[in-house]
Amino acid sequence: MLSTLALTGCQIESSTTTTATQQPSVSDASHYQSIIDAAQGKPSMDVLRVYISQEPLLTDPAQHQANIDSLWLMLTQMKPEQIQGIEADENILLGWVDLLDIYQNNKDDPEALRTGIDDWKTRYPHNPGAKNLPTALVQGTITKVGANPRIALFLPMSGQGQVFGQAIMQGFLDAQKGLPSSPVSQASTAPAASQGSGNDVLDQIYQEVAATVNENANTEVASSTVSIDAVPTNTQSVKVFDTQGKAMPQLVAQATSEGYNLIVGPLLKSDVQAIAQMNAPVNVLALNELDANQLQPRTNLCYFSLSPEDEAKNAANQMRLEGKQMPLVLVPASPFGDRIAKAFAEEWQAKGGGTALMQTFGSTASLKESINRGQGIRMTGTPINVATQGVEQANGSIDAVYIVATRDELTLVKPMIEMAISSRQRPALYASSRSNQGNSNADYRFEMEGVKFSEVPLLAGANNNLRKQAQGKVNNDYSLFRLYAMGIDAWSLANNYDNLQNNGQFRVNGASGMLSVHENCVIYRELPWLQFKQGQVKPAQ
């Protein structure tokens, strides 16, 4: 039965490569998939023909690539004696078999394999693999980056994202020159910051990076034990490519043709999606992260971002270390807030905690209305639903609150929490770096007494000389300090790229956090914690 159905598919394939006398319906794709499923992965020429017949019917890029990858996997698993009986007019199948021969003869020589594939593409221009090579085959054409990679930096250097691209570029290029040494005293004075941009696109990125600032004052961070590692040395020239309004395939082709073997960037998520879907034979350290359901293990693609989800995971870990049992996550009423709450709950439960609770708040204006009416924030919430089995239902009183808010919001949220509970039942308060603007005066610091918050090492007293250097490069715009720190760490990661893929124990004390590598080569940042205590900002105890 399988053979009969597969041969029917072969007839459709043959027609699509010659006269195309019939147009198969989209429903045929499901029909072919049922044949593939019935084969249960057992390699055969019949199933290869079904994959070939199904391929032109798949319009979704992910499904189309999966078809090609599955065909190639099956082909590489077949023994030579199984690859028999190919008709003269089966051009697509003949092309795949020829490509297999090229791969087997050159799989230990990436350069020769690339040359062979390029020649194959000229001989089989209509084969679907000529446009979309199998992912596994692409991986075989990629050489290791090595100790001195030639780096192409993909950033928005014009248009609305220019300010962010420039901050990252400055950190990256300053790291190439080497970081200033840390002074003997680690006491640090954080600089003032400017207003937000007022631009929708820029403000969207600010939401992911930091809050805007509207005062001019200084915040002193007490002596800190946080450190930033020395950066690698690489004298190869770095070329910056402006991604604004540019198509990723053209930029990647230009960079590789000029001899660059590592791309750092792009920054915008849409560009990261585009470069990931290209399946290009070049190593990439993307400066943003895709959603979890879009990540796939690739030996030439890593992700590094200033992820607010990482901060939420940091908070969950910190609370567990301090013995907290019943957390409440207080976030904006938005998809952004939902993402943060989910990330916190997943990490909380992964570390042995029970169900975490969530409560949302509205705009600053609505918070002010509530506080004027004497309405506080009660320590209640709804369970955060995450796909975890066997987690106990939350019980008892809230003993810790993780607040994701801007400074203006936090100045309202904290007293609203205190209004609703007695002083003997007050939970420990934790905030994200979103609330830290480095410009708090003494009144604010006393008002925030006891609040703990996470922050990047560059702004947590790790290296005062480096902070002063950064201050001049980002024009005292405090929100850009974190992006400058990201640029420094992108340099360190780029020059350790081979270790990211091959060393699960890789660690570096970076300017944006303690960096480690998680699944799918996603870089995770662990941040130090600070605390408002007696009118000062000190390392959290």
Question: Where do the protein language model's features map onto the residues?
Answer:
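Segments of small-molecule ligand-sensing domains
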Residues: V474-A540
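Bacterial signal peptide processing site
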Residues: Q11-S14
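C-terminal motif of bacterial Sec signal peptides marking the signal peptidase cleavage site
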Residues: A6-G9
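Extracellular/periplasmic periplasmic-binding protein-like sensory domains
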Residues: K414-I488
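Long amphipathic alpha-helical scaffold segments
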Residues: I68-G171, K177-Q186, G196-S237
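Periplasmic-binding protein-like
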Residues: G259-L268, L285-L287, L328-P332, T380-R407, ...
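Extracytoplasmic ligand/sensor domains, especially the bilobed periplasmic-binding protein
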Residues: L262-G265, K269-A343, E347-L357
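Beta-alpha junction/loop-to-helix N-cap segments that form part of ligand/metal-binding clefts
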Residues: A167, Q186, A192-A292
